[in-house]
């Protein structure tokens, strides 16, 4: 992809681990991938999604290893319904510790473009951001 095509992309990273967020955001900027806006939790992500238009997002949906834990996919649903400033069809990748058949089915229904299983290297996130197509960031 030509450098000028991806240089101005605004992307969202929702991840509770501060070191991982900072590493990915700074590396993406230095590689010319665009600007990574960071959110440590869903509330911060919603605030950013209301205020900014994004070309793509990588969202951690960790459930942990708790028994009978269900993944919270409400943020994905709201993005896909067009309730935020971004185009409802933006590419979304999710990070999770486990990927059951049920979760993968739920993510497929929400048009999630990539599932990243933890643990992983920061490079995997950078590759996910680099793969996002530069869609129009605003709703039609």
Task: Specify the residue positions occupied by each region the protein language model found.
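Conserved phosphotransfer microenvironments
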Residues: 56-86
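Conserved acidic segment of CheY-like receiver
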Residues: 8-19, 24-28, 57
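Alpha4-beta5-alpha5 "output face"
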Residues: 29, 80, 105-109
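CheY-like receiver
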Residues: 2-5, 135-140
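C-terminal output helix
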Residues: 120-129
């Amino acid at each position: 992809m030509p450098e000028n095509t991806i240089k101005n992309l605004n992307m969202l990273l929702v991840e509770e681990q501060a070191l991982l967020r900072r590493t990915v955001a700074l590396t993406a900027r230095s590689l010319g991938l665009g600007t990574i806006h960071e959110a440590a939790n869903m509330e911060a992500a919603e605030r950013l999604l209301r205020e900014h238009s994004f070309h793509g997002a990588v969202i951690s949906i960790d459930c942990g290893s708790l028994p009978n834990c269900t993944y919270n996919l409400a943020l994905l649903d709201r993005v896909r319904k067009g309730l935020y400033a971004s185009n409802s069809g933006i590419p979304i990748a999710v990070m999770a510790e486990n990927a059951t058949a049920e979760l993968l089915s739920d993510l497929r229904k929400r048009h999630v473009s990539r599932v990243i299983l933890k643990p992983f290297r920061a490079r995997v996130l950078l590759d996910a951001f680099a793969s996002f197509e530069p869609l129009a960031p605003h709703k039609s």
